[in-house]
Amino acid sequence: DVYKRQLLPDARRVCCEQELLQFASERRKIEWLSVRVLLYFMLKEDKQIGYSSEGKPFLTDDSFFISISHTKGYVAVILNPKTPVGIDIEQYGKRVHKVFDRFIRPDEQVEAYQGDTTWGGLLHWSAKETVFKCMKNADADLRKLCLSHFIPQKEGTFQVREYATEGQSLFSVGYRICEDFVLTWTSC
């Protein structure tokens, strides 16, 4: 309770306390509140987040495009005043290998980072989630997104081509590998 008072303005804190009642899970409450605190920290003013019928977040005053992601212990928010954006954060975990067939295309190659292909797999997964969030009415088949070949470094950029639309847009995706997660972001 002390932290909420220090991190959000009083009017917003009261509103948040009421909105938090909709969540049963303590983890989900923390994620939801963390996003609002991070947004307030970024903008130094209170903003309301709404959600489209597809579940995509938006600021109710339309001042910025927004994308949100969370993973165990972390949240990520990206804003852009002019163009839609996407962001994704994925915690390190070997389980990603079990689902490679759901998102890695035969013409894609997953490279290792510091001898571990888990990082490369997570970057593929995260980048495709990021681009998917940025696209309008996107097909949820992540195999319709193709990463250009790249050798993972601690941070950098790579290209992602989407094959879900006639336009087959090309996205530049930024990334960073941290101690226990990867973070990817793009703008449309």
Give the ranges of each region predicted by the language model.
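Core catalytic alpha/beta fold that binds nucleotide/phospho-ligands
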Residues: 1-188
